């Protein structure tokens, strides 16, 4: 079987996202609380997710939450966008 396409998930605020993001990232703000969980639950649980924020703290929380919700393949991009050496869309 083919590997599902990984999803890049940015859990920062919309303002932070608009100031620069990793290509193809989708933005769901962790700080929305219940709204975050609601939106996360609409995603495909079978896909791998690469989760990032500014420095890695919020994404670590998001990864834990997603695992609790049944997402099996979630990865925290350590160091966040600050440490990201790839392309950033501004």
Regions found by a protein language model. Name each.
Residues 8-10:
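Structural scaffold elements adjacent to functional motifs in cytosolic proteins
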Residues 2-6, 15-48, 54-90:
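Rhodanese-like catalytic fold shared by cysteine-dependent sulfurtransferases
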């Amino acid at each position: 079987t083919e590997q599902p396409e990984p999803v890049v998930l940015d859990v920062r605020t919309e303002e932070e996202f608009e100031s620069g993001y990793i290509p193809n990232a989708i933005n769901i703000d962790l700080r929305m609380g219940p709204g975050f969980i609601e939106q996360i639950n609409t995603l495909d649980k079978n896909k791998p997710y690469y989760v990032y924020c500014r420095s890695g703290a919020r994404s670590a929380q998001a990864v834990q939450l997603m695992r609790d919700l049944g997402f099996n393949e979630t990865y925290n991009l350590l160091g966040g966008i600050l440490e990201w050496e790839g392309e950033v869309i501004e």
